[in-house]
Amino acid sequence: MSVTVFITYDLAPGVTKDQYWEWSREIDQPMASRQPGVLSYEIVWIDGTGTGETPSQVVEVIEAESWEAWQKVNEYPEMQAAVASFFQIAEKSSIRVFYGTKIEG
């Protein structure tokens, strides 16, 4: 059964929204979305909340064949440069990873 993975984070100090968007479009999304086990890969820039406080700037929403399949993605040789650049783009202390199963209606 597939899982949905949510990764939330803020940008590292000094990284602008424009720099992030360019990196996301040119490196991250094309690379990660074509890896084995990844069914869909979407990035959402958070514009705001109903409460005024934004807990994260970015949410990645990934549909994967399984949690184990997703865990393998960052180990693939093709992903090494993207992973290294991610840790320069994202504020490490802000990264949170959640996964779960959709409740079908």
Regions found by a protein language model. Give the residues of each.
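Short, well-ordered beta-strand segments in beta-rich or mixed alpha/beta enzyme
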Residues: 3-11, 43-77
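Short amphipathic alpha-helical segments
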Residues: 16-43, 78-83
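Functionally constrained cores in energy, signaling, and assembly domains
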Residues: 24, 28-32, 60-64, 70, ...
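Residue-level signal for secondary-structure boundary sites
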Residues: 15, 68-70, 105
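Intrinsically disordered, low-complexity N-terminal regions enriched in serine/proline/glycine
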Residues: 8, 19, 40, 75, ...
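Glycine-rich beta-strand-turn "strand-cap" elements at beta-sheet edges
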Residues: 39-59, 82-105
